[in-house]
Amino acid sequence: MKPNITILKPNPTITEMFQYCNAPLKNTRWSWGAVSVNNDIFLRVWENELAVIEEKRFYRVTHLAVYKDKMSHPGIRERLDHVERICSGSPSFMIKCRAKNPKAIPREFKYFDVSHIGVGGKLIDIEGDKWLEQKNIINLKNN
């Protein structure tokens, strides 16, 4: 289940990273994830939106309270589609991102971890939002 990812330069942009995953973003401004040519789902997740439950790591993949009045936003609609695909069995992967200010809404992107991606596991519900288990990590430095 390891995706075929080849990093072509040492410090790619987040847009290039999705391209390297064979999952180009639909829109570089509002897309938070993408579907690969193999129907794998690649999602941006924020490194600080982590819940550890029974020694398992879960990252928030929906934040509906923030978007309750903006459900027509193309980014949230696309994210909900990605979550539905994961619920239906599509393999999923997470690109962990850091915000300049983790408390700001909307957040400004600072950087992402180009050396690893998380392998998604089960989705759980925490207070109305979906959180995706990170069941493994793929080291991209050796690809």
Regions found by a protein language model. Give the residues of each.
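Short helix-coil boundary/hinge micro-motifs
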Residues: M1-N142
